[in-house]
């Protein structure tokens, strides 16, 4: 039977971003003592980060399992004994990490590969200390590929008119059917880019003749963080060797590199090295390669050197098939009228569709009731989408109302924080809910294309990191979308 902490972790896994859960929740240990949940982190750095940014998420999940009177206490465990830290083995595999029931058959030898004639050496104390002080997100010690747990596969990817080209291209990368070693996937958030990257990684690992296939999967932000860690640890050459010697590189969210020249230089050098040795590379981005700004032309050229595939919003039939497949995985019977309601009302984001379904199932189980249309209406209030899209004028109107600004203030040249945040929210909503291009959005605000792109990227970064500003803006945007769509539908 799943422990209480296991149930809480399961809720968090389905409500937090995968990266947040992977890095910050997985290492935690939890124990319930009466009405107190004691959560132990591996060190004070992690404990402090969890207290500052995830405390309310943990408490909310705990209340759903234990009750509303639960008290959550986050502490740091005692430092581990000074055992030798594992170091690089030849051609290390890299890492993806949501735990599953998959077996863990191998370990990395605790020596670093050295040129012939040299004795193996262990990591310097300075390197170990730098990595430990920087905390979990910057810890880039290798993990054998056999321990990688790919969360998705091609088998559970629902193909529709919106994504069939991207899926076919990803499959082609796995069977040498694409006639190129580079693939660039682009789409808005929550439409399947991560799913396809995981599917490519899983497929290539399963078909490899090697017991330890050399596949690297990480986001551009993780790449940057690990490079910073290597610089601080004075171990850049080992970092370079690690990523320039892989057979497959799966690099997510490359739009993060905009405006970061030094990071772009390292990514470009890595891509050049990999392409010269015939390695396969899959990039993903929230923007098409042509829309990336403040990115070196050579790097953009490398992005465009292979096959470019975009993913659009799923149509009604595809959304309905996604819901049925997820219900099958959850082993629940989903009435047709509930399926149709969810598919009709949530139209822009597959992740929201899955989240809404999960919350519906969780509510039914907690209340020990059957899933019904009435219950679905109660849940969908948090995700409600009208059949028609908001137009640009409606977005401007509701942003002004939501942020307490006049249209003149929203469109002014002022750099006041509240004006900038509101404008960025308007850019994001216009991109999400209209067919306007970034240039057209910029024209309507008398701004440049690059300004709109920068604003959207900055706002998405705040929301993805779940900073106080990011949470506040995400809640405001969600409320605006919900109320704005309801108002729009009534007109």
From Swiss-Prot:
Region (Domain III, AAA+ region) location: 147-364
Origin superkingdom: Bacteria
Stored PROSITE patterns: DNAA (PS01008)
GO MF annotations, alphabetized: ATP binding; ATP hydrolysis activity; DNA replication origin binding; lipid binding
Gene Ontology annotations for the cellular component aspect, listed alphabetically: cytoplasm; plasma membrane
Alphabetized SMART domains for the sequence: AAA (SM00382), Bac_DnaA_C (SM00760)
CDD domains according to UniProt: AAA, Bac_DnaA_C
Region (Domain IV, binds dsDNA): 365-491
InterPro entries, alphabetized: AAA+_ATPase (IPR003593), Chromosome_initiator_DnaA (IPR001957), Chromosome_initiator_DnaA-like (IPR020591), Chromosome_initiator_DnaA_CS (IPR018312), DnaA_C (IPR013159), DnaA_dom (IPR013317), DnaA_N_dom (IPR024633), DnaA_N_sf (IPR038454)
Primary localization class, coarse: cytoplasm
Region entry Domain II, spans: 68-146
Record keywords: ATP-binding, Cytoplasm, DNA replication, DNA-binding, Lipid-binding, Nucleotide-binding
Subcellular location: Cytoplasm
Binding positions (ATP): 190, 192-194
Domain I, interacts with DnaA modulators, as annotated region: 1-68
Record-linked Pfam families: Bac_DnaA, Bac_DnaA_C, DnaA_N
GO process terms (BP): DNA replication initiation; regulation of DNA replication
Subunit structure comment from the entry: Oligomerizes as a right-handed, spiral filament on DNA at oriC.
Recorded family membership: Belongs to the DnaA family.
Record function comment: Plays an essential role in the initiation and regulation of chromosomal replication. ATP-DnaA binds to the origin of replication (oriC) to initiate formation of the DNA replication initiation complex once per cell cycle. Binds the DnaA box (a 9 base pair repeat at the origin) and separates the double-stranded (ds)DNA. Forms a right-handed helical filament on oriC DNA; dsDNA binds to the exterior of the filament while single-stranded (ss)DNA is stabiized in the filament's interior.
Domain notes: Domain I is involved in oligomerization and binding regulators, domain II is flexibile and of varying length in different bacteria, domain III forms the AAA+ region, while domain IV binds dsDNA.
Record-given protein name: Chromosomal replication initiator protein DnaA
Gene name per UniProt: dnaA
């Amino acid at each position: 039977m799943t422990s209480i902490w296991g149930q809480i972790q399961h809720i968090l896994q389905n409500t937090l971003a995968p990266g947040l859960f992977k890095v910050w929740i997985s290492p935690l240990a939890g124990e319930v003592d009466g009405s107190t949940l004691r959560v132990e982190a591996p060190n004070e750095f992690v404990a402090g980060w969890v207290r500052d940014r995830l405390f309310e998420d943990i408490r909310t999940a705990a209340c759903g399992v234990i009750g509303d009177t639960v008290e959550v206490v986050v502490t740091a465990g005692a430092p581990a004994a000074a055992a030798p830290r594992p170091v690089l083995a030849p051609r290390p595999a890299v890492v993806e990490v949501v735990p599953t029931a998959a077996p863990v058959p191998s370990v990395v030898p605790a020596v670093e590969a050295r040129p012939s004639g040299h004795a193996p050496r262990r990591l310097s104390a300075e390197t170990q200390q730098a990595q430990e002080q920087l905390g979990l997100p910057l810890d880039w010690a290798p993990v054998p590929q056999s321990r990688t747990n790919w969360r998705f596969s091609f088998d559970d990817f629902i193909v529709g008119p919106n994504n069939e080209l991207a899926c076919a291209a990803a499959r082609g990368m796995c069977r040498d059917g694409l006639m190129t070693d580079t693939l660039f996937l682009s789409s808005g958030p929550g439409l399947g880019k991560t799913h396809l990257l995981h599917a490519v990684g899983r497929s290539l690992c399963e078909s490899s003749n090697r017991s330890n296939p050399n596949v690297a999967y990480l986001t551009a932000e993780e790449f940057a963080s690990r490079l910073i860690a290597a610089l601080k640890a004075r171990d850049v050459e080992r970092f370079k060797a690690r990523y320039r010697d892989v057979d497959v590189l799966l690099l997510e969210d490359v739009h993060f590199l905009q405006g970061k020249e030094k990071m772009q230089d390292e990514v470009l050098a890595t891509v050049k090295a990999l392409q010269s040795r015939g390695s396969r590379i899959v990039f993903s981005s929230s923007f098409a390669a042509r829309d990336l700004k403040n990115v070196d032309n050579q790097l953009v050229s490398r992005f465009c050197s292979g096959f470019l595939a975009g993913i659009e919003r799923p149509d009604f039939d595809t959304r309905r098939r996604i819901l049925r497949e997820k219900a099958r995985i959850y082993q629940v019977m989903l009435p047709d009228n509930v399926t149709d309601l969810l598919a009709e009302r949530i139209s822009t984001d597959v992740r929201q569709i899955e989240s809404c379904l999960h919350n519906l199932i969780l509510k039914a189980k907690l209340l020990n009731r059957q899933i019904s249309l009435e219950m679905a209406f109660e849940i969908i209030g948090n995700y409600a989408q009208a059949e028609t899209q908001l137009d640009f004028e409606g977005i401007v109107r509701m942003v002004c109302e939501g942020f307490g600004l006049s249209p003149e203030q929203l469109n002014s040249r002022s750099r006041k924080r509240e004006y900038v945040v509101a404008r960025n929210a308007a850019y994001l909503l216009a991109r999400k809910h209209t067919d306007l291009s970034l240039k057209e959005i910029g024209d309507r605000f008398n701004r440049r294309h690059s300004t709109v792109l920068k604003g959207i990227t900055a706002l998405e970064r705040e929301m993805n990191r779940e900073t106080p500003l990011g949470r506040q803006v995400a809640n405001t945007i969600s409320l605006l979308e919900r109320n704005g769509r309801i108002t729009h539908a009534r007109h």
